[in-house]
């Protein structure tokens, strides 16, 4: 019993690294104890990138500087060294089970401890043997080497575990982003359908009001006619009840009234006014909207570059621009009202949106960064001034050959694209027909494809206009011009 207790105590004060009684025992934060030399060597060969080591027993990280001497364990070790008795279990372990002799030899071929009779037996005869004291240090070093290799492998496993944890976090984040993206896109689709449903319901509500007002008017007219007929019937019946003399005296008047009475059939709603609801091309709408959502992934964050211009105001976030002067600006100076967005766009795909819901005059698109004033050839500039002579050729101020790729609105019903003929390169103003006034315009630049597209975000992302110019300059800049409208234009941020 005493020997069992002694073995338990020795096990508690044995170094997990060298498997010997602890020498200069130190303890880590996890309370496991090691020889100072062993844990120092272990830390030097296995410390993490953050300067911490991992406990060889429980793998819990620890700062090397936190190792503390364990005097209590050191005292126990010193007392055990003075204890000379050999436990019964150790005595049994040191005795050959076959011959009853002490195990003093080590067979190198069979890698086992034997007694002197085993050495002479047929099983081990001729094998190289040595005293166990002679191979003690050799095999300790081998085991120590094996331990270091295993600990390195354990470190590799820990690194792999860290990599897996990072991958887990990355995947969770990516999937969460995808979940939010799916939810946002389907919310957009639901909002789109709700908007279209509301439009149709408003049309029906308006139609119902018009029809009911018309029918009510017809009912009132019919009621007036009915009252006239009944009054006349009452007069005729009254005359029939009179004496012959009295009847004949009033008959002529009553008959004239009766003969002159003509009925007009009340107006009804013609059958052609009736309409059967036809759902819009939802498939086409969704395809267009999906296309818009696909390019919205290229949303670029930009700011407006403040220019030294007294008539232009830019807010401190540099995302809103408006005309603030009440002085008359000459037509030839309108280009000065333009402001560039940054950064420059030199490659790849880029998308941004502009809120123009309150503006009734604006220009949007790209500029080559020079904002140079083009040579004017006529008095016709964006339709603001009329030609002085019908033979004067129309040219535009904002055209691709002058470094502008823009569309604009002069008033809520006139939309124009300032392009040029791909063959003659003559400037031209193209009038754009839109079903509704856009409140938000999306702009998409694809440098590789050489296209600049404008979308009506407020109308399911319908395409407004597209420039095809594979020869864009090396650097182009988003261009914003509030014209002479005092209402602001605002660069929108991406949806949250």
Curated annotation (Swiss-Prot):
A zinc finger (B box-type) spans 91-132. One of its GO terms (cellular component) is nucleus. Its main location: cytoplasm. InterPro entries: B30.2/SPRY, B30.2/SPRY_sf, Butyrophylin_SPRY, ConA-like_dom_sf, SPRY_dom, TRIM/RBCC, Znf-RING_euk, Znf_B-box. A motif (Nuclear localization signal) lies at residues 268-276. GO terms for biological process: negative regulation of interleukin-6 production; negative regulation of NLRP3 inflammasome complex assembly; negative regulation of reactive oxygen species metabolic process; negative regulation of toll-like receptor signaling pathway; negative regulation of tumor necrosis factor production; positive regulation of protein catabolic process; positive regulation of viral entry into host cell; protein autoubiquitination. It is found in: Cytoplasm; Nucleus. Zn(2+) binds at residues 96, 99, 118, 124. Residues 173-239 form a coiled coil. Residues 281-496 form the B30.2/SPRY domain. Keywords: Coiled coil, Cytoplasm, DNA-binding, Metal-binding, Nucleus, Transcription, Transcription regulation, Zinc, Zinc-finger. The keyword Protein biosynthesis does not apply. A zinc finger (RING-type) spans 15-59. Induction: By the TLR ligands lipopolysaccharide, CpG dinucleotide and polyinosinic-polycytidylic acid. The keyword Coiled coil applies. Signal peptide: none annotated. It comes from the Eukaryota. Residues 205-210 are annotated as: Highly hydrophilic. Trans-acting factor that regulates gene expression of interleukin 2 receptor alpha chain. May affect IL2R-alpha expression through cis-acting negative regulatory elements or through competition with proteins that bind to enhancer or activator sequences. Negatively regulates Toll-like receptor (TLR)-mediated activation of NFKB by promoting degradation of TAB2 and TAB3 and preventing TRAF6 autoubiquitination. Negatively regulates production of reactive oxygen species (ROS) which inhibits activation of the NLRP3 inflammasome complex. Homomultimer. Interacts with NR2C2/TAK1, TAB2 and TAB3. Does not interact with NLRP3, NLRC4 or TAB1. This is Tripartite motif-containing protein 30A. The lineage of its organism: Eukaryota, Metazoa, Chordata, Craniata, Vertebrata. The gene is Trim30a.
């Amino acid at each position: 019993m005493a020997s069992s207790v002694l073995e338990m105590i020795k096990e508690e004060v044995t170094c997990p690294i060298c498997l010997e009684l602890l020498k200069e025992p130190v303890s880590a934060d996890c309370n496991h104890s090691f020889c100072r030399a062993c844990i120092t060597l272990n830390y030097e060969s296995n410390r993490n990138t953050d300067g911490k080591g991992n406990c060889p027993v429980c793998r819990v990280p620890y700062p090397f500087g936190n190792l503390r001497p364990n005097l209590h364990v050191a005292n126990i070790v010193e007392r055990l060294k003075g204890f000379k008795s050999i436990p019964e279990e150790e005595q049994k372990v040191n005795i050959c089970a076959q011959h009853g002799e002490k195990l003093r030899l080590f067979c190198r071929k069979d890698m086992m401890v034997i007694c002197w009779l085993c050495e002479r037996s047929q099983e081990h005869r001729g094998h190289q043997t040595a005293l166990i004291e002679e191979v003690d240090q050799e095999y300790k070093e081998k085991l120590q080497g094996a331990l270091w290799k295993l600990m390195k492998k354990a470190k590799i496993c820990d690194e792999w575990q860290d990599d897996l944890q990072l991958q887990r976090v990355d995947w969770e984040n990516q999937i969460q982003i995808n979940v939010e993206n799916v939810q946002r896109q389907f919310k957009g689709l639901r909002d789109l359908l709700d908007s279209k449903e509301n439009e149709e319901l408003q049309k029906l509500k308006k139609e119902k009001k018009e029809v009911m007002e018309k029918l009510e008017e017809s009912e009132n007219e019919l009621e007036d006619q009915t009252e006239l007929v009944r009054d006349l019937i009452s007069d005729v019946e009254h005359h029939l009840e009179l004496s012959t003399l009295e009847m004949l005296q009033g008959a002529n008047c009553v008959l004239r009234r009766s003969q002159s009475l003509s009925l007009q059939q009340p107006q009804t709603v013609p059958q052609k006014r009736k309409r059967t609801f036809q759902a819009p091309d939802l498939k086409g709408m969704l395809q267009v909207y999906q296309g818009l959502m696909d390019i919205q992934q290229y949303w670029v964050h930009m700011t407006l570059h403040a220019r030294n211009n007294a008539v232009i105001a830019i807010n401190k976030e540099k995302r809103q621009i408006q005309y603030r002067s009440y002085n008359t600006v000459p037509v030839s100076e309108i280009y000065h009202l333009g402001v560039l967005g940054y950064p420059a766009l030199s490659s790849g795909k880029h998308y941004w949106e502009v809120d123009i819901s309150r503006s009734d005059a604006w220009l949007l698109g790209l500029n080559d960064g020079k904002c140079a004033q083009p040579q004017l050839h006529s008095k016709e500039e964006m339709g603001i001034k009329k030609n002085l002579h019908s033979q004067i050729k129309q040219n535009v101020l904002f055209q691709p050959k002058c470094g502008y790729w823009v569309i604009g609105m002069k008033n809520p019903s006139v939309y124009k694209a300032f392009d040029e003929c791909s063959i003659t390169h003559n400037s031209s103003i193209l009038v754009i027909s839109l079903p509704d006034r856009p409140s938000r315009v999306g702009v998409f630049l694809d440098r590789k494809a050489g296209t600049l597209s404008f979308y009506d975000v407020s109308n399911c992302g319908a395409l407004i206009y597209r420039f095809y110019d594979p020869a864009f300059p090396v650097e182009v800049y988003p261009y914003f011009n509030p014209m002479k409208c005092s209402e602001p234009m605002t660069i929108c941020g991406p949806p949250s």
